[in-house]
Amino acid sequence: MELENIVANTVLLKAREGGGGKRKGKSKKWKEILKFPHISQCEDLRRTIDRDYCSLCDKQPIGRLLFRQFCETRPGLECYIQFLDSVAEYEVTPDEKLGEKGKEIMTKYLTPKSPVFIAQVGQDLVSQTEEKLLQKPCKELFSACAQSVHEYLRGEPFHEYLDSMFFDRFLQWKWLERQPVTKNTFRQYRVLGKGGFGEVCACQVRATGKMYACKRLEKKRIKKRKGESMALNEKQILEKVNSQFVVNLAYAYETKDALCLVLTIMNGGDLKFHIYNMGNPGFEEERALFYAAEILCGLEDLHRENTVYRDLKPENILLDDYGHIRISDLGLAVKIPEGDLIRGRVGTVGYMAPEVLNNQRYGLSPDYWGLGCLIYEMIEGQSPFRGRKEKVKREEVDRRVLETEEVYSHKFSEEAKSICKMLLTKDAKQRLGCQEEGAAEVKRHPFFRNMNFKRLEAGMLDPPFVPDPRAVYCKDVLDIEQFSTVKGVNLDHTDDDFYSKFSTGSVSIPWQNEMIETECFKELNVFGPNGTLPPDLNRNHPPEPPKKGLLQRLFKRQHQNNSKSSPSSKTSFNHHINSNHVSSNSTGSS
């Protein structure tokens, strides 16, 4: 029993480390798997792709890199990219150095005598920016100037890009991105835990070596529990939210028995484990503050999509290899219709907000209550309305949430106590974060006085704790309870519409990030000498014929060897080849 767990963990750790070889977990055939199609095969994509500058040149990571490469080959455009890079650097500069960095940008790019002067930024805007810089520099100082540059780039430069080999290469990447995804796209490793409809296991993309967590939703279990809308809702929300503080959906596919969500793998365990199983319960305030800030950023990204999470609790906050956190398990999240409120008594006992317990209509307010519960628990080492391991009925916990005030020990600083009280205000209308400004209001609380959120969002701040890379922060394989077999449920063609909505393959932004992070983009994104067209982008160069299979090569060789034979034997042999060829094709298509 113990041996099985050791073997499973050893295999997983080796996969996480890249297998110990130069390929870093990639298949021997990874270049074959990611071989570009000839550009002639991308014409349908060219006709149908949405030609939106923001999407193609900014939001999509590979699109952004290729547009930059295009600009760097055009005299006069390179300085615009350099200016945008400088503005991005300015926004993550420490507050005390903003003035100095701002002056550098003004002098280099917004002064007429400069060799890289950005003429497209109007003089009135330059004067306003300079005045604000002299008064008090802020993070958003150059936002309007950057917007002005983007407005210029989305014009003639963007249209030139669409006719360039760089956009053709982007179409090749999109063609690869849209290839079918199946269970054979991945290697499967040990079970990490259980979800509502099935197991969660570690997996690895064969082509890139990137590790993910695969959440299996058993088809029969979904159908028995009538969970189709819940499963599809989670998938669609994950697909739309692109946040470094929320687990990302990279792939969605189906097998004969299950629907599979391939998600960011978080190897560092959950906050519940770290609060209660690593020394004395709770964290030092500095560590609690860091996690609270990242959770707040994740909520802000969800709320930007008008999505309320509704299930904030320590076990749903996961740590990655480096100690950063992400919000996971969006099964109870729901998108709120524009200008509307929703109702629903869902969540976890002890963490549900008063308005949820009272079955009142609400918007995003339950998430700020949940944040208050989390900050309290991280510092105190127990939840605000229930003692650690306290045996108490659900009704009593609900009563405490509605009627009693939480108790604060010596562990809380005045700022920590203040933010918890303001987030745990029972009247949602008076709660911190529930006004028009939302997360921005919470960020201004004195508890976060020393937190530079721009640098945090850019991944430039070191976490207070880094998980052990040689540890597997989950239960032993045999301690994870297995699901029972679902009986009395049959799958039929009426389920196919739901499966087709779910199994949509790769998700653009995570897939493109995977190509960049695993250096597949760097290795494959090669053009001809001195910027010339490579054969796969040359319309006058016919595409390479597909490689022949082993059987075809053997038959060809045998045919050549027998070409000197008598006509009768040759006819007989050809008949034999044709028979085998038909048989082989039949087998291959099954």
Swiss-Prot record:
Disulfide cross-links: none
User: What's the protein name?
Assistant: G protein-coupled receptor kinase 5
Which source organism? Homo sapiens
The record's region (Interaction with calmodulin) falls at 20-39
Factors inducing expression? Overexpressed during heart failure.
Q: List, as start-end ranges, the regions of compositional bias called Basic and acidic residues.
A: 538-547
* Catalytic activity field: [G-protein-coupled receptor] + ATP = [G-protein-coupled receptor]-phosphate + ADP + H(+)
Annotated region described as Disordered, given as residue ranges: 531-590
Biological process (GO), any one = Wnt signaling pathway
Q: What is the effect of changing residue 41 to L?
A: Exerts a protective effect in heart failure and ischemia
Q: What class of enzyme is it?
A: transferase
Q: Where is the AGC-kinase C-terminal domain?
A: 449-514
UniProt modified residues of type Phosphoserine: 484, 579
Q: Where is the RGS domain?
A: 53-171
Report the gene name. GRK5
Which cell locations does it reside in? Answer: Cytoplasm; Nucleus; Cell membrane
Outcome of swapping residue 485 to A: 15-20 fold defects in kinase activity
Subunit: Interacts with ST13 (via the C-terminus 303-319 AA). Interacts with TP53/p53. Interacts with HTR4 (via C-terminus 330-346 AA); this interaction is promoted by 5-HT (serotonin). Interacts with HDAC5. Interacts with GIT1.
Q: Which family does it belong to?
A: Belongs to the protein kinase superfamily. AGC Ser/Thr protein kinase family. GPRK subfamily.
